[in-house]
A protein has these predicted regions:
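Bacterial N-terminal signal peptides that target proteins for export
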Residues: 1-7
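Bacterial N-terminal signal peptides
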Residues: 7-16
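Sec/Tat signal peptide C-region and signal peptidase I cleavage site
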Residues: 17-21
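A cross-kingdom marker for long, charged
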Residues: 22-87, 91-350
Length: 350
């Protein structure tokens, strides 16, 4: 039901339509497309439980309660966006609040994993404007800028690789779940390459998870968006925390001293991931190191609009002693690394 869904999702921590026929796909891309579709189908075939440790879901972590922070600006922006859509557009965009579309997202490009909904690429100017107004109402200024910069990396990828089937700054799709309301659950999803936002609203509570913020290259040294960069604050905050640990703490935090593979585990199709804690526990950190840890978390949570971000940070802070920080790789200024932050109420991977 809707109440259980809220609790579960919180645990996880314009021109014309551009359509490409199967004949336009290279054979290797078609094979990848098939593999991703099959993986998504398998995941959606399993009942949703949520991310948990091997001890199971902890009940009662996320009560439905008033935060005292109005969601009216988000709701009104969503209404304005929906009002710009035609009947045909609405049939593609609108889903029931409990539709599996919530789970049917991916961080890979649209050439490999087709999306539902309507893309920025297909919208007219009025629709684009209202879509961006919705994002501006839902996100902080920093979150909005990061969203825009991630989309710009797609232009850089196109300049490097070509392949208009796969890459483009407007190949990002909007869907709406439920009907914007002051008291009933609703939300929206933005889904595309390296950028996924699932945004759930109930009364004055907001949950923005699961979310994926990524991109390549992280810095564009040429092209239309030369100088564009992404995820530097998240990178620097994590490294600063690791470098603040003493030798014994670093040993406790380090899962593997060598970064030789993709260590991400909570990607698409991992709604029911069983993941036990690793690394150093928050209770083993000094007061300053705990503040550093919260600063890393804030670099992600801060993409959410304020004061909703502060509400989320307060929830996270209540579990800081039970929050684990783990590291893969070395910790010099120029090292390649991965880190994870994992607590009863949030899971972050970088």
């Amino acid at each position: 039901n809707n109440i259980n869904y809220l609790a579960a999702i919180l645990v996880i921590s314009f021109a014309g339509n551009v359509v490409f026929s199967q004949s336009q796909y290279p054979s290797n891309l078609l094979a990848q497309k098939g593999n991703f579709s099959a993986g998504a189908a398998r995941a959606l075939g399993q009942p949703f439980q949520g991310v948990a440790t091997s001890d199971g879901i902890i009940p009662g972590l996320f009560p439905i309660k008033s935060t005292g922070v109005s969601t009216a600006p988000i709701r009104e922006a969503a209404d304005r966006f929906l009002a710009t859509l035609s009947t045909a557009d609405l049939s593609r965009v609108h889903f029931a609040i409990n539709d599996p579309e919530w789970r049917d997202w991916s961080n890979v490009d649209v050439g490999i994993f087709p999306r539902r909904g309507i893309s920025l690429e297909e919208m007219n100017e009025a629709q684009k404007d209202s879509a961006w107004e919705l994002l501006a109402a839902a996100l902080s200024a920093e979150g909005l800028e990061q969203t825009q910069n991630i989309m710009k990396t797609e232009q850089t990828l196109f300049e490097i690789n070509g392949e208009p089937i796969r890459y483009g700054t407007e190949k990002y799709y909007f869907t709406m779940m439920g009907i914007p309301s002051s008291d009933s659950p609703w939300g929206f999803q933005l889904d595309g390459h390296h950028l996924v936002i699932n945004y759930f609203v109930l009364g004055d509570q907001v949950v923005m998870t699961p979310a994926f913020w990524g991109g390549e290259p992280v810095y564009a040294d040429s092209g239309m968006y030369e100088g564009n960069h992404i995820l530097q604050n998240e990178q620097d905050a994590g490294l600063q925390l690791m470098q603040s640990l003493d030798a014994a703490q670093k040993r406790a935090a380090t899962v593997d001293p060598e970064k030789v593979r993709n260590n991400q585990v909570a990607a698409a199709n991992q709604d029911n991931l069983i993941l036990d804690y690793e690394g150093i526990k928050g209770a083993e950190l000094t007061s300053q190191q705990k503040l550093n840890l919260l600063n890393v978390i804030r670099s992600f949570v801060g993409a959410l609009r304020n004061p909703h971000a502060e509400v989320t940070m307060d929830e996270i802070g209540q579990h800081i002693d039970d929050t684990y920080f783990s590291w893969v790789g070395e910790s010099a200024d120029d090292s390649v690394f991965y880190y994870r932050i994992h607590s009863p109420v949030i899971l972050i991977e970088f």
